[in-house]
A protein has these predicted regions:
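S-adenosylmethionine
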Residues: 1-443
Length: 443
């Protein structure tokens, strides 16, 4: 691990990423930028440190509140992040000796906030190191209020936990929180090759492969693997996609040789799944950066029937097609295990803002479907405002549209709820997803 002065570059990158998040940056973008100069091993180390710290932030703050005189409100937010990173190294990274976790955190605090901050960091982290056996989350003193206790132990915002408990109860909500705090596996989708062939290539390259939940042709890989260094990646023989996203396209069950519009398409996994069946997939996104990344994958996969279009989903100039998939921008509450920053960024008011945008996109998407054609609305949210409520409102306002369940066997019965796709992390062991098929009348 390369040192940045007396501090390793990986730790500097981790602290800088948390600074970026406070400024409003997204985790994926910040990690890509801050870890650009690190080798693959240090990048994985930095990612584990940052993701793990975010997943346990509430627990760490409870620990710090009892050990920082005057509480966390009296110290700088950046110093709080340095302490959080130090705690994660002490309690959860066995590869890091305690003296290194403490010394590096102290030096980082000194460099960024002066000698007083470094002394505080040294005292707090040394005390935590001495008391580590009593600091397991299961042993922490919890609030008497059941929701407060669950939110603290599961390290999620209280308002979200309260919503989920009202919907699913305490036991299932606890399972969801635990799922969100685990590392999401990497799942590969074969492209232009069958699963057995790709599995053989990966195992020959020393990659451990396992089966995936709910899919018989996905490959779940474990261990620190640099995908871009694999020959199968360079040959365009797979792309990365969680089973929940794959289930959305299987649920869609578009007719062979259809012309399909995939609105809000980046990063592109659903477009590539649709391309297996469709004659043409018109993949739309308004972000030039996201489209450029998707363009690179189109080239790598040689997906010749995928055409990219830069457009706002609310205002497109496209003509009517056989089918439209609306993978609507959403709060992403079904993907918190992949995006641990999102739980702390989300506000209850965001639900109304997001739903308003979704209504506009859904209305515009419906205009792109020919008479008799198919409209599929999907999200990676768990929230009813973005899912059932959205679809029910649309169907009530547009009598020419009807809900149409998928063909028998398109997806496992376990993920169907009254003909709608409903994938839940705590029940199915994958990301969350929701989708509904709607058919337009012929005239």
């Amino acid at each position: 691990m390369v040192a940045h002065g007396a501090i390793t570059d990986a730790r500097v990158a981790a602290a800088d990423i948390l600074t970026d998040l406070r400024a409003g940056d997204l985790l994926d973008a910040s990690l890509e930028r801050r870890a650009a100069g690190l080798d693959s091993r240090d990048r994985r180390w930095t990612q584990e440190l940052v993701y793990g710290t975010l997943r346990r932030r509430a627990v760490f703050d409870a620990i710090l509140t009892e050990r920082v005189k005057g509480g966390l409100a009296r110290i700088d937010s950046d110093l709080t992040d340095i302490l959080r990173l130090g705690i994660y190294q002490l309690l959860h990274m066995r590869s890091v000796p305690p003296y290194a976790a403490i010394a590096q955190s102290v030096e980082l605090a000194k460099r960024r906030h002066g000698i007083g901050a470094s002394k505080l960091t040294n005292a707090v982290l040394r005390r935590i190191d001495r008391e580590r056996d009593a600091l397991d989350a299961s042993r922490l003193p919890l609030p008497t209020d059941a929701i407060d206790a669950l939110a603290l132990a599961g390290s999620h915002p209280r308002w979200l936990v309260a919503r989920w408990v009202a919907r699913w109860g305490e036991v299932e909500t606890r399972c969801l929180l635990e799922t969100n705090n685990t590392e999401a596996p990497l799942v590969l989708r074969p492209f232009g090759i069958v699963r057995a062939q790709l599995e053989s290539m990966l195992e020959a390259a020393g990659v451990s492969v396992d089966h995936t939940p709910l899919l018989d042709d996905g490959l779940q890989i474990t261990g620190g693997v640099s995908l871009t260094e694999l020959s199968a990646f360079r040959q365009g023989l797979f792309f990365v996609q969680d089973p929940a996203a794959t289930l959305v396209t299987r649920y869609a069950a578009i007719a062979p040789e259809s012309t399909v519009v995939d609105l809000c398409a980046a990063p592109g996994g659903k477009s590539f799944e649709l391309a297996r069946i469709a004659s043409l997939v018109i993949a739309c996104d308004r972000s030039p950066t996201r489209l450029e990344r998707m363009r690179q994958n189109v080239t790598r996969l040689d997906a010749r029937n995928v055409v990219l279009v830069a457009t706002d989903a609310r205002h497109t100039a496209l003509t009517q097609v056989d089918a439209v998939l609306v993978d609507a921008p959403c709060t992403g509450t079904g993907t918190f295990r992949r995006h641990p920053d999102a739980r702390w960024r989300l506000r209850v008011s965001d639900l109304a803002v997001t739903a308003a945008a979704q209504r506009l996109i859904l209305r515009a998407a419906a205009e792109l479907v020919r008479p008799g054609g198919l409209l599929v609305y999907s999200t990676c949210s768990l929230e009813p405002e973005e899912n059932d409520d959205m679809v029910d409102h649309f169907l009530a306002q547009h009598v020419e549209w009807t809900h149409e369940p998928p063909p028998y066997g398109a997806v496992p019965d376990a993920v169907l709820d009254a003909g709608r796709l409903r994938v839940l992390p705590q029940r199915h062991g994958v990301d969350g997803a929701f989708a509904v098929r709607m058919r337009r009348a012929h005239s």
